[in-house]
């Protein structure tokens, strides 16, 4: 049986309000936050179970998160990739590119893509945050969430030329934003822990959507 791993609004909200010096340092300089509700439209509903679709859950969380930022952090502009149930193309790569284009055009400082994963096992639970990079052996070994990542949303590294380009991009990304992205991701996970949710940790994945953006980014 396949079950959804539900992300709650209060957990998503926690990433907006980091406490202490670490949070202040990470939040400094963020003026535009781009929030992406993952999936959308009839062709890309995402994970689903008994009439509940990931695309709808993601949108509710994204809109709620945006309102919390706007109400509590008036100095930060919020930009959404979508505010309704929509897709940008019947081609998934073009759909992801369109979301990244919105973020790039907005001059975003931070890109947050919200997803709700699914698994065959009813015992699978918890929250995780993804940043751009290649999976570690430990991450691959612990991927018990079978449907966590749509393969079409990941970069295919089978082609040597593509792999070389992607690894060069990752190296540049880590030099520019890597430390920030990982620090933000760990802060997100730390705040999730306040609500007694199982911490699945920060993981690296070769995410197409993130590779198209020119800003600090993570998926949660």
Give residue ranges: language-model regions.
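Acidic, glycine-rich loop-and-strand cores that form catalytic or ligand-binding grooves
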Residues: 176-184
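Short glycine/proline- and acidic residue-enriched helix-loop micro-motifs
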Residues: 166-175
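Catalytic-core regions of hydrolytic enzymes
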Residues: 22-34, 39-156
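Bacterial N-terminal signal peptides
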Residues: 7-14
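Conserved small/polar residues in nucleotide/adenosyl-binding loops
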Residues: 213-220
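Positively charged n-region of N-terminal signal peptides that target proteins for export
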Residues: 1-5
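Short catalytic/ligand-gating loop segments at beta-alpha or beta-beta junctions
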Residues: 157-166, 183, 192-212
């Amino acid at each position: 049986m396949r079950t959804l791993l539900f992300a709650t609004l209060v957990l998503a909200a926690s990433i907006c309000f980091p406490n202490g010096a670490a949070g202040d340092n990470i939040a400094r300089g963020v003026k535009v936050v781009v929030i992406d509700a993952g999936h959308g439209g009839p062709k890309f509903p995402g994970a689903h179970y008994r009439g509940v679709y990931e695309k709808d859950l993601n949108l509710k969380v994204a809109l709620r998160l945006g309102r919390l930022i706007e109400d509590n952090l008036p100095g930060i502009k919020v930009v959404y990739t979508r505010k309704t149930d929509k897709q940008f193309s019947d081609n998934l790569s073009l759909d992801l590119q369109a979301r990244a284009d919105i973020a790039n055009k907005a001059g975003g400082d931070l890109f947050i893509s919200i997803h709700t994963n699914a698994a065959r096992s009813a015992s699978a639970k918890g929250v995780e945050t993804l940043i751009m990079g290649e999976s570690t052996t430990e991450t691959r070994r612990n991927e018990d969430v079978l449907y966590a990542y749509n393969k079409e949303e990941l970069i295919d590294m089978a082609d040597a030329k593509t792999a070389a380009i992607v690894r060069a991009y990752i190296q540049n990304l880590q030099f520019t934003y890597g430390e920030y992205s990982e620090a933000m991701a760990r802060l997100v996970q730390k705040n999730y822990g306040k609500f007694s949710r199982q911490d699945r940790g920060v993981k690296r994945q070769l995410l197409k959507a993130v590779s198209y953006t020119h800003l600090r980014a993570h998926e949660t």
